[in-house]
Amino acid sequence: MSAIKITNVAVLHNPAPFVSPFQFEISYECLNSLKDDLEWKLIYVGSAEDETYDQLLESVLVGPVNVGNYRFVFQADPPDPSKIQEEDIIGVTVLLLTCSYMGQEFLRVGYYVNNDYEDEQLKEEPPTKVLIDKVQRNILSDKPRVTKFPIDFHPEEEQTAATAAPPEQSDEQQPNVNGEAQVLPDQSVEPKPEES
C-alpha cells in the first residue's frame, strides 16, 4: 500500500498564454509518516521524437511529511521556447507532473497540452517564425493519464529489521503488522526549493 494518496490535482489559470507560469493545486493524504521529503517535478516534453528537448521546469521538495491531509500550489516557469524546435512549438505535446520519495518515482500524471494561436487569422495563416507571445496553451486537464509505481516507502525499517535479528526458520507465513497512526488535521505545507 502506498504511504501517499493523491486526492486531487487542479490545473489553475487554464487556458493561459504560453509564456505564463504553470500552476497546479495539489492535494494529498499521507497515510504513514515519512522521514524524508517528497520531490515534485514538472517536465515539459519538447518533442515526441527526442527526449533531449524535454525541459525540467521546476523541482521542489516538500517534507518531512507526517500523517494527515496536505494541499499546496506548485508553480513553475513556462518552457524556454529557444530550447524547443520551431516546428514543435505549435501543436500538441505532453506535460508530466511526477512525485518521488527517496529517489523512487511513485506517481506520474501526464497531461496533453495544445499550443496554438488564439487569433483566428494567425491560425489560418501562421507566420513562418512562431510569435511566441501570441501562442496560447490549453492543458487538457479533464483527461490526465495517471500512472502509479509501487515503491518501498520505508526501506530503513527493512534494513534495520534485517540486521537486528536473523530470520526464523519456519514454514508459516508471518503476518505483516503495521502500527496504528493518528490522523492530524488538514495542514498547509510550503514547498521548499531543492538544494543544488
Swiss-Prot record:
> Where is the major localization of this protein?
nucleus
Where is there biased composition of kind Basic and acidic residues? 146-157
Which keywords appear in this protein's UniProt record, sorted alphabetically?
Chaperone, Chromatin regulator, Nucleus, Transcription, Transcription regulation
Q: In which tissues is it expressed?
A: Expressed in leaves and flower buds.
What segment(s) does the record annotate as region Disordered? 146-196
Task: Report the locations given in the UniProt record.
Answer: Nucleus; Nucleus, Nucleolus
Q: Would the keyword Transcription regulation be found if you checked this record's keyword annotation?
A: yes
Q: Which GO terms describe its biological process?
A: cell division; chromatin organization; double-strand break repair via homologous recombination; mitotic cell size control checkpoint signaling; regulation of cell size; trichome branching
- Write out the GO cellular component annotations: cytoplasm; nucleolus; nucleus; rDNA protrusion
Return the Pfam families for the record.
ASF1_hist_chap
User: What protein family does this chain belong to?
Assistant: Belongs to the ASF1 family.
Q: What does this protein do?
A: Histone chaperone that facilitates histone deposition and histone exchange and removal during nucleosome assembly and disassembly. While encoded by a region of the Arabidopsis thaliana genome that is homologous to the Brassica S-locus for self incompatibility, this protein may not play the same role in Arabidopsis thaliana.
Summary of subunit composition and partner proteins: Interacts with histone H3 and histone H4. Component of the HIRA complex made of UBN1, UBN2, ASF1A, CABIN1 and HIRA. Interacts with HIRA.
Name of protein: Probable histone chaperone ASF1A
Which organism does this record belong to?
Arabidopsis thaliana (Mouse-ear cress)
Write the gene name.
ASF1A
